[in-house]
């Protein structure tokens, strides 16, 4: 049968026991603070999802022990439910709002009155504001515990606590929810402007890259303008309304009719809007989209080579050997003709893309030392 130690200080020594209790308190406070930071979490020992609570006490809450062998006592704290109610939409309650300059008096015992939901509504403060202030207060409390040094004297620590608490309460009381919401909306708008820098001059729609903006111009505004011109001329053929999927137009023989404008600069063969000079268009054999070689960043060898076969754009690109577009991450493009090859379809197969320029066997036979990969590829 275990014996009860009525006075543990005599068995272990006064200083040793105080240091052990202090280390235990510091460890527990840090552990609870770290758990509160990553809440909610699943306790691996009990299998219970832990939530934040109000059972953790501070040094300033300590009281003298009342029972034999009891070192400290802590005041009991009533359980309170976390309020997450939204203010009602009844316009009658909004007429009873009080000016924000008016503040409710404090209780005589020095603690602020715990307002009900109705009192918060009458003061013009949402319940969400109280919840946010309480959460901010708990987060600051956690950060203060984590940053607190274990070797700080107890007297200095209590003075810091007494100085920090009123500052924190004043800061949360004077915080305006409208300004925070406006700042969040402004930050979201600036983030969207940064992510989508390309803006349509006609409708104001934003895109992440220039090809997306060009596609929007071509298939939204340009298509509507062409439709209006066709109605004015009263042509027999109805205007073609292109959808976002870009269905290619086919002629009587089944071949795709190419577009007469560049998908990047929206210029025709008579003028490249980027360079201001006339330039011939290169069209995809599958979807009919067109582009200037300079807009496509083609080399001289590419510009001449794409005229000799049915060129495909990057969205329609398929392997020349197997004829499929599957495993597009394995496609390797020739730097002289822009043909696509699966790395596992090559003879011999290639495990990784080669460094530098790469030319296919057709361009090696045709260009020889003029190939882009001459001197780089064995």
UniProtKB/Swiss-Prot annotation:
Cellular component terms, GO, for this chain's entry?
brahma complex; chromatin; nBAF complex; nucleoplasm; nucleus; SWI/SNF complex
InterPro entries linked: DPF1-3_N (IPR025750), Znf_C2H2_sf (IPR036236), Znf_C2H2_type (IPR013087), Znf_FYVE_PHD (IPR011011), Znf_PHD (IPR001965), Znf_PHD-finger (IPR019787), Znf_RING/FYVE/PHD (IPR013083)
Q: What main location does UniProt list?
A: nucleus
The molecular function terms of the Gene Ontology recorded here are: zinc ion binding
Keywords of this entry: Activator, Chromatin regulator, Isopeptide bond, Metal-binding, Myogenesis, Neurogenesis, Nucleus, Phosphoprotein, Repeat, Repressor, Transcription, Transcription regulation, Ubl conjugation, Zinc, Zinc-finger
Q: Which GO terms describe its biological process?
A: chromatin remodeling; muscle organ development; nervous system development; positive regulation of cell differentiation; positive regulation of double-strand break repair; positive regulation of myoblast differentiation; regulation of G0 to G1 transition; regulation of G1/S transition of mitotic cell cycle
Q: Where is the protein found, in the record's own terms?
A: Nucleus
Q: What is the effect of changing residue 360 to R?
A: Abolishes binding to acetylated histones H3 and H4
Cross-link Glycyl lysine isopeptide (Lys-Gly) (interchain with G-Cter in SUMO2) mapped to chain: 99
What residue spans carry the Basic residues bias annotation?
168-186
Biased composition regions of type Acidic residues, renumbered to the chain: 148-163
Q: Which SMART domains match?
A: PHD (SM00249), ZnF_C2H2 (SM00355)
Q: Does the keyword Repeat apply?
A: yes
The answer on whether this UniProt entry bears the keyword Isomerase reads no
Query: Which SUPFAM superfamilies does the UniProt entry name for this protein?
Result: beta-beta-alpha zinc fingers, FYVE/PHD zinc finger
**Region annotation Disordered: where it falls in the sequence:** 145-193, 225-254
What ranges of residues constitute the C2H2-type zinc fingers? 198-221
Start and end residues, zinc fingers (PHD-type): 259-319, 316-366
Quaternary form? Component of the BAF complex, which includes at least actin (ACTB), ARID1A, ARID1B/BAF250, SMARCA2, SMARCA4/BRG1/BAF190A, ACTL6A/BAF53, ACTL6B/BAF53B, SMARCE1/BAF57, SMARCC1/BAF155, SMARCC2/BAF170, SMARCB1/SNF5/INI1, and one or more of SMARCD1/BAF60A, SMARCD2/BAF60B, or SMARCD3/BAF60C. In muscle cells, the BAF complex also contains DPF3. Interacts with acetylated histones H3 and H4.
> What is recorded about the domains?
The PHD-type zinc fingers mediate the binding to acetylated histones.
Protein family per UniProt:
Belongs to the requiem/DPF family.
Q: What does this protein do?
A: Belongs to the neuron-specific chromatin remodeling complex (nBAF complex). During neural development a switch from a stem/progenitor to a post-mitotic chromatin remodeling mechanism occurs as neurons exit the cell cycle and become committed to their adult state. The transition from proliferating neural stem/progenitor cells to post-mitotic neurons requires a switch in subunit composition of the npBAF and nBAF complexes.
Recorded protein name is: Zinc finger protein DPF3
């Amino acid at each position: 049968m275990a014996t009860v130690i009525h006075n543990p200080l005599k068995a272990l020594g006064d200083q040793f026991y105080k240091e052990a209790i202090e280390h235990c308190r510091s460890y527990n406070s840090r552990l609870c603070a770290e758990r509160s930071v990553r809440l909610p979490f699943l306790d691996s020992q009990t299998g219970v999802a832990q939530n934040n609570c109000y059972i953790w006490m501070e040094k300033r809450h300590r009281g003298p022990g009342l029972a034999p062998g009891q070192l400290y006592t802590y005041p009991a704290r009533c359980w309170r439910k976390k309020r997450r109610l939204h203010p009602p939409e009844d316009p009658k309650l909004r007429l009873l709002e009080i000016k924000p300059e008016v503040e409710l008096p404090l209780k005589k015992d020095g603690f602020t009155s715990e307002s009900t939901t109705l009192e918060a509504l009458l003061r013009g403060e949402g319940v969400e504001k109280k919840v946010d202030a309480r959460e901010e207060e708990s987060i600051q409390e956690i950060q203060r515990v984590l940053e607190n040094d274990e070797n700080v004297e107890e007297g200095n620590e209590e003075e810091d606590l007494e100085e920090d608490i009123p500052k924190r309460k004043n800061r949360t009381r004077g915080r305006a929810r409208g300004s925070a919401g406006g700042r969040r909306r402004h930050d979201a708008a600036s983030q969207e402007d940064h992510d989508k820098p390309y803006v349509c001059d006609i409708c104001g729609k934003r895109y992440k890259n220039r090809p997306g903006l060009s596609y929007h111009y071509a298939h939204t505004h340009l298509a509507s303008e062409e439709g209006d011109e066709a109605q004015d001329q009263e042509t027999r053929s109805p205007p073609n309304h292109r959808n976002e999927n870009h269905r290619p137009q086919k002629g009587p023989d089944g071949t795709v009719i190419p577009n007469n404008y560049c998908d990047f600069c929206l210029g025709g063969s008579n003028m490249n809007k980027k360079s201001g000079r006339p330039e011939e268009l290169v069209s995809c054999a599958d979807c009919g989209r067109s582009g200037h070689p300079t807009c496509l960043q083609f080399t001289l060898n590419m510009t001449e080579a794409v005229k000799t076969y049915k060129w495909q754009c990057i969205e329609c690109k398929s392997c020349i050997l197997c004829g499929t577009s599957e495993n597009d991450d394995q496609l390797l493009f020739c730097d002289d003709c822009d043909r696509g090859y699966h790395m596992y379809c090559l003879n011999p197969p290639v495990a990784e893309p080669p460094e530098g320029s790469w030319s296919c066997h057709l361009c090696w036979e045709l260009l020889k030392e003029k190939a882009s990969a001459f001197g780089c590829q064995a």
